[in-house]
Amino acid sequence: LERPKIAAEMKDLDQPSRAVLRKYGVRFGAYHIFFPALLKPGARTLASLLWALKQDDVDMNALGGAQHLAASGRTSFPADKALSQDAYRVLCYKLAGERSVRVDILERLADLIRPALSWRPGTGAEKPAGAFDGRSFTVTQAMTSLTGSAGEDFASVLRSLGYRMDRRAPLPEAPNPAEAPAEAAAENTTAAENEAPAVQTEAAASE
């Protein structure tokens, strides 16, 4: 289940009820609510076949190709336009822009993005990878490696999750007291000349 689509129901689900569901293996993620046990290849293939039997116009060749890619352990693969979003959903993938990405991978992506968004400059806390200004984050290699995509493909994944891409100059770094003021100023000037991509949105919370 895509969490935003059942946001109202989630508000009515109290913590004791969620605890009961967790005992049965339900995972409450930032973007999805799912059973990790159903991510196994056999379960996904069976679910997609049962779903296809109830549909009238499923492209079985395209579905078979997606089943094969899913069973091979791919965390993501190019989306086939012949398949609907529901077809990927029963395979436990999300149709995310130009790619279909396994839902647990999107939750791991959320785990990388969350600390980058929660970090605040000037607090003395260690700056996590991808942190920018406390309201946005920069894309890291760990994020793109996790989804097996980069460039516009990865940008389309982020857009499907509600993020928007932006380009901004990097924040000036605080000068090192041991350095001469002129040297620190020169370094800050050089850094400001280089633009860094930033992604801006509100952070989603997982449980």
Model features per residue range: what roles?
Residues 1-151, 156-157, 161-172, 176-183:
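Acidic, serine/threonine- and proline-rich low-complexity intrinsically disordered segments
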Residues 176-207:
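Long, low-complexity intrinsically disordered regions
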